[in-house]
């Protein structure tokens, strides 16, 4: 089956995404079980799930790296990317969304839409990914299908259209009404393989009728022929409904909603059927866009195995046995093992050692990967996350991925002197795998600092150092990753001259520096050759290096752009080094005039508390410089949404527990950087000295 050729129309590249603990890995496990890939179902709480293949994942029962797995269902090849639901791993979700064609969002029937669901949904909106929703855990206490559908509409503004209704809930959840076919499925056994297709139970006919009418109205909105039939009261066939639904999903106008219990094996095969019926194939999505490396001209590439190669390396992982694996999506063309490809971001040729298709943690060697496929490459040396691989005769750079800045850092040191070098190598490998993880040396103290997206993120990094790389280390207290920026548009000069004996040094430049919302930009506006072309990159490098340490308290400077507009040079004494120093001097001079301010990470916090503790909790959030955004009731509790500076959130879990007698819980995730009040800024500067 695996070696059979599948036409592109029969491919589905989908991601499974959700809030932590919504049952995502369990659902993926069941999909692998029903599609014949696994003979015994792995249970997450037994620590045996096949998709969770890193040791820490099996211990913690959460998914950290997104494994890409190939399986087969009803004559289709389905590539599944399982993504983590914990906020510290948003980057994994971001990278997988970049390479999928469709996504299944899993909700917990008890909670409906949760904060991480919102984050992931927004990320999917950015990439215009068609999606559907599976409301899981229908067998659990407090499961409420209609409430969950309501949260999709209210919190995500999604046009959520139920295609199914559950028969019973909690302990009595026994089957599913299929609104498309207008019949019912009753489960007869625990494995969910024995089921009866019967009529809709009497006591649910009225409700099924009401929801089927809503379904028909939704498909009529996207299909004029159905609209005419519907208005004239004609019968609309099941096939017509399915065709219109597919059209609506692909246009991001309809989000189909299904239900079930992955753990109890109910609803999973129907979910697989729906993935094939309504999710896009690589042919249904727009041709991938990119630019020509030398001219910057926009280009597109079709999903066609005969077109020139265009592929994106979306994840780098280190495998203990075969070394570096580059997970790759082939958008067009064909990649063959043993051949050379061109990495257009690095401008280097790379040799492909082996090509493998992944199944959670076992590999199948293949000779080639074609347009629309996902696989991993062994043997690449210089490729990192987000790089494009293509033909050197036909180069293209696909849109790169942007990753958020780390918000928290800790100092780390090996327990033994011998561990220092080992730790350096290990940290470099981990940083290569994960673009939101950074490691650097603090120039003043000489300490090694690791920075990431949250405490769990860094805990797992330290854990991997010990397990995979056998480096024992001591870890300091978490610190907030402050940044600096400017508020004024200024001009400044950088002049570096040294002419005492021997060869002199001469570099001189004028820059304009201005605040911006986006990433760092460098614009060369020098005319008339006042600075020779070959020295321009050195000025840019000098500015970028100097921006790693701002003038307020030595934190990295962000959100600014630079325009180089003038300067001068000396025929003999000028060098790249001299211009690099001049660039860094110009940067420091500009920053001292540009109203520099300190920025701190502001976190989006969502606290769920029983009503009687609300006053206390809100008072506490206000005392932490929090800004309350709103409150909504949810299942006997109140949900408080607020923005709070990260520096005020350390130890919050303990405070919340004592204020609510253990009944409150919270989640937080990085939202944006904002200016630090003067009094706090002075305190931070004082602590740095």
Curated annotation (Swiss-Prot):
**What's a single GO CC term here?**
cytoplasm
| Matching PROSITE patterns | G_TR_1, G_TR_2
Q: Which GO terms describe its biological process?
A: ribosome disassembly
Q: Which residues bind GTP?
A: 18-25, 82-86, 136-139
Q: Which stretches make up the tr-type G domain?
A: 9-283
The record ties this protein, via CDD domains, to: EF-G, EFG_III, EFG_mtEFG1_IV, EFG_mtEFG_C, EFG_mtEFG_II
Q: Which NCBIfam families match?
A: EF-G, PRK12740.1-3, PRK12740.1-5, small_GTP
Q: What family does the entry list?
A: Belongs to the TRAFAC class translation factor GTPase superfamily. Classic translation factor GTPase family. EF-G/EF-2 subfamily.
Describe the task this protein carries out.
Catalyzes the GTP-dependent ribosomal translocation step during translation elongation. During this step, the ribosome changes from the pre-translocational (PRE) to the post-translocational (POST) state as the newly formed A-site-bound peptidyl-tRNA and P-site-bound deacylated tRNA move to the P and E sites, respectively. Catalyzes the coordinated movement of the two tRNA molecules, the mRNA and conformational changes in the ribosome.
Name of this protein = Elongation factor G
Q: Which organism is it from?
A: Clostridium botulinum (strain Langeland / NCTC 10281 / Type F)
Traced from the root, the source organism's taxonomic lineage reads: Bacteria, Bacillati, Bacillota, Clostridia, Eubacteriales
């Amino acid at each position: 089956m695996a070696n059979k050729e599948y036409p592109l129309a029969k491919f589905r590249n989908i991601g499974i995404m959700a809030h932590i603990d919504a049952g995502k890995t369990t659902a993926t496990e069941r999909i692998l079980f029903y599609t014949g890939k696994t003979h015994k179902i792995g249970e997450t709480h037994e620590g045996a799930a096949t998709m969770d293949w890193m040791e820490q994942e099996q211990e913690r029962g959460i998914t950290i790296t997104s494994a890409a797995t190939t399986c087969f269902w009803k004559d289709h090849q389905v590539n599944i990317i399982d993504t983590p639901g914990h906020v510290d791993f948003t980057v994994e979700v971001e990278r997988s969304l970049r390479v999928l064609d469709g996504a299944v969002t899993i909700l917990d029937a008890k909670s409906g839409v949760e904060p991480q669901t919102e984050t992931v949904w927004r990320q999917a909106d950015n990439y215009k990914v068609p999606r559907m929703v599976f409301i899981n855990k229908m067998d659990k206490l407090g499961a409420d299908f209609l409430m969950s559908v309501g949260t999709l509409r209210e919190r995500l503004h999604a046009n959520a259209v139920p295609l199914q209704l559950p028969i019973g809930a909690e302990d009595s959840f026994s089957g599913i009404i299929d609104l498309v076919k207008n019949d019912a499925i009753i489960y007869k056994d625990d494995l969910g393989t024995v089921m009866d297709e019967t009529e809709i139970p009497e006591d649910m006919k009225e409700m099924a009728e009401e929801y089927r009418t809503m379904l028909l109205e939704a498909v009529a909105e996207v299909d004029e022929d159905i609209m005419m039939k519907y208005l004239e009261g004609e019968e609309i066939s099941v096939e017509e409904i399915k065709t219109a639904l597919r059209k609506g999903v692909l246009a991001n106008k309809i989000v189909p909603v299904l239900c079930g219990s992955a753990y109890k094996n109910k609803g999973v095969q129907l979910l697989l059927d729906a993935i094939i019926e309504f999710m896009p194939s690589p042919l249904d999505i727009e041709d991938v866009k990119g630019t020509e490396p030398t001219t910057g001209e926009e280009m597109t590439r079709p999903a066609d195995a005969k077109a020139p190669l265009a592929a994106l390396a979306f994840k780098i992982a280190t495998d203990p046995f075969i070394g570096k694996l580059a997970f790759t999506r082939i958008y067009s063309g064909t990649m063959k093992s043993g051949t050379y490809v061109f990495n257009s971001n690095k401008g280097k040729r790379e040799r492909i050692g082996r090509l493998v298709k992944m199944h959670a943690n076992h590999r199948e060697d293949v000779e080639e990967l074609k347009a629309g496929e996902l696989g991993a490459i062994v043997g690449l040396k210089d490729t990192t996350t987000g790089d494009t691989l293509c033909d050197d005769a036909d180069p293209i750079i696909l849109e790169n991925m942007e990753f958020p800045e780390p918000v928290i850092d800790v100092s780390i040191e090996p327990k033994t002197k011998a561990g220092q070098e080992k730790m350096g190598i290990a940290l470099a490998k981990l940083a290569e795998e994960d673009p939101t993880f950074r490691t650097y040396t603090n120039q003043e103290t000489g300490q090694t600092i690791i920075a990431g997206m949250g405490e769990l993120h860094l805990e797992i990094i330290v854990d991997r150092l010990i397990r995979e790389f056998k480096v024992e280390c001591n870890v300091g207290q978490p610190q907030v990753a402050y940044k600096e920026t400017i508020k004024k548009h200024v001009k400044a000069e950088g002049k570096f001259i040294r002419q005492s004996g021997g060869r002199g040094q001469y570099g001189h430049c004028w820059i304009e520096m201005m605040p911006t919302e986006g990433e760092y930009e460098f614009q060369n506006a020098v005319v008339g050759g006042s600075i020779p072309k070959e020295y321009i990159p050195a000025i840019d490098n000098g500015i970028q290096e100097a921006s790693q340490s701002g003038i307020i308290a030595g934190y990295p400077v962000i959100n600014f752009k630079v325009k180089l507009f003038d300067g001068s040079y000396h025929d003999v004494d000028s060098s790249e080094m001299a211009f690099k120093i001049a660039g860094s001097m110009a940067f420091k001079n500009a920053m001292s005039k540009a109203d520099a301010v300190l920025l701190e990470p502001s976190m989006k916090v969502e606290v769920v508390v029983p009503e009687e503790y609300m006053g206390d909790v809100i008072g506490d959030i206000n005392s932490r410089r929090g800004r309350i955004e709103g409150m909504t009731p949810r299942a006997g509790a109140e949900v408080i949404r607020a923005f709070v500076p990260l520096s005020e959130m350390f130890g919050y879990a303990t405070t919340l527990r004592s204020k609510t007698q253990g009944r409150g819980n919270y989640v937080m995730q990085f939202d944006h950087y904002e200016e630090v009040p003067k009094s706090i800024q002075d305190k931070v500067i004082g602590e740095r000295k």
